[in-house]
A protein has these predicted regions:
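Surface-exposed loop/interface segments of Gram-negative outer-membrane beta-barrel transport/assembly proteins
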Residues: 2-6, 16-103, 121-237, 285-319
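Conserved helix-loop functional segments at active or binding sites
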Residues: 249-250, 279, 285-286
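His/Asp/Glu-rich mid-to-C-terminal helical/loop segments that flank catalytic regions of hydrolases
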Residues: 110-114
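Solvent-exposed loop/turn segments connecting transmembrane beta-strands
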Residues: 3-5, 263-268
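Transmembrane beta-strand segments that form the barrel wall of outer-membrane beta-barrel proteins
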Residues: 1, 253-262
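Conserved short loop/turn motifs at secondary-structure junctions
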Residues: 31-35, 259-264
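Hydrophobic, lipid-facing positions within transmembrane beta-strands of outer-membrane proteins
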Residues: 11-15, 104-108, 168-174, 237-243, ...
């Protein structure tokens, strides 16, 4: 990056707590916070400069020398991409982009032992993400290698923009877990419920013809007011269960069933039901494999079948 003032800063904080209450209740919690600041070039930042460098013809001079010995930056005309802006001009003459990002994560768990082999669990997690981007770019004039100006100079302008993004994602889950061993039989079962939801909002504004280049506030722009804003939210609710059985650690079976309901689909089409099954054979524990224990510590064959849903459609598809 060319010039002074370009920088990035990052601050991290993390805390973790674990405790047990009366040997039956376990509580854990973790929180983390990230504060990231970056000051970069305008016009897509340094990545834009690198992309332009790859597209610029190596046969063109960097500058076109005019009689007064002041150099004008040279742009190229490429039939594949159209006019390609001089990357050195972007590095020297473009404005600034300031990006501030804050992320707060938290997860809390509680596990209660009711009786031997029967536990109730609860988990809550939250992710809060905010990002603010302020950008200012002055008017940039461009010329071909023969000194003639690009037609784009007629529309060249300075502009200022600001954007803000807020996202909050939360998850709540409850489980009931059962495990029991009777002789050579191992039984297990799980029942659960989960709820996940997300709220997202954006706000942006752009102005042209900035009065004073040193004042980078949105109200400094005089013409071409453009404002935008969005809000969307979605939620996913799930019920799930699992049973598993093992005999003598050799023969294994597991069955799962889950029901998922999403707000991203229309009423009457929001719920889906998804089963899965698996069976396994731990052949390394059979007597006829005892001769190979020195070279094969574990050998297992497993077959499974299952279905899963997919709610990954654009957030504004429905409703």
């Amino acid at each position: 990056v060319v010039g002074d003032g370009y920088s990035s800063k990052r601050h991290n904080a993390r805390i973790s707590v674990n405790t047990e209450v009366y040997d039956r209740l376990k509580l854990t919690g973790q929180m983390s916070y990230v504060d990231f600041y970056k000051k970069d070039l305008g016009y897509s930042g340094t990545s834009g400069v690198f992309r332009l460098s790859q597209r610029m013809s190596p046969l063109l001079p960097v500058m076109w020398q005019i009689p007064d010995e002041n150099g004008r930056m040279v742009d190229s005309e490429n039939w594949s991409y159209g006019s390609v802006r001089n990357p050195l001009q972007v590095a020297y003459e473009s404005g600034m982009e300031e990006r501030k990002t804050r992320v707060l994560n938290g997860i809390f768990n509680a596990d209660l032992k009711i009786i031997d082999g029967l536990n109730v669990g609860m988990q809550y997690s939250a992710n809060i993400y905010t990002r603010q981007v302020d950008e200012f770019n002055p008017k940039m004039l461009s010329y071909y290698s023969d000194g003639s100006p690009l037609k784009a100079n007629e529309d060249a302008k300075d502009y200022i923009s600001q954007s803000h993004l807020d996202v909050m994602t939360q998850t709540l889950q409850f489980t009931l877990n059962f495990n029991k061993t009777i002789g050579r039989h191992e039984l297990g079962a799980l029942l659960g419920f989960s709820q996940e939801w997300e709220n997202r909002s954006t706000l942006g504004a752009t102005r042209d013809n900035v009065m004073v280049e040193d004042i980078h506030v949105i109200s400094a722009g005089m013409i071409n007011f453009m404002n935008s804003g969005t809000k969307d939210e979605w939620a996913l609710r799930s019920y799930f269960g699992r049973v598993n059985y093992a005999f003598d650690g050799k023969y294994l079976f597991e069955a799962n069933l889950r029901a998922d309901g999403t707000s991203r689909f229309a009423k009457g089409n929001r719920w889906g039901y998804f089963p899965s099954f698996s069976a396994g054979w731990n052949f390394s524990r059979e007597k006829f494999m005892e001769f190979a224990t020195s070279v094969l510590s574990s050998g297992k064959l497993r077959a499974s079948w299952g279905e899963l849903g997919n709610q990954n459609i654009p957030g504004n598809y429905y409703p």
